[in-house]
Regions:
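Positively charged, phosphate-engaging catalytic surfaces used for nucleic-acid and nucleotide handling
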Residues: 1-100
Length: 100
């Protein structure tokens, strides 16, 4: 049996919220409730580094789903990855060595 468009939409929104919670600590609805004055969705207000991290997490989430990892486990793992990646992306680079 094929899923209906409504079911597909719900599944997609649910997976999007896994990424939202891992990255921002809240679902899209929670963010909208906290920011009723904002015109766009939470990702539209994300920084470039947050968007880079989200893109990476979307790819990793697909791999984790393919591996059969349960959603709760994926959420924890993605949150740990988001924290680590944001540390790297936000690093000012003062202690890095360059290839020059």
């Amino acid at each position: 049996t094929e899923i209906t468009p409504a079911q597909a939409s719900l599944i997609y929104a649910n997976e999007a919220d896994v990424l939202n919670v891992a990255m921002f600590g809240m679902t899209a609805k929670q963010w909208r409730d906290l920011n009723p004055e904002k015109k766009y969705n939470m990702r539209d207000y994300a920084t470039v580094n947050e968007l880079i991290c989200l893109s990476n997490m979307e790819n990793l989430n697909a791999v984790f789903i393919d591996q059969g990892m349960p959603q709760g486990e994926r959420l924890v793992k993605l949150n740990q990855i988001a924290i680590q990646q944001m540390r790297v992306l936000e690093d000012d680079g003062d202690d890095r060595k360059y290839l020059k």
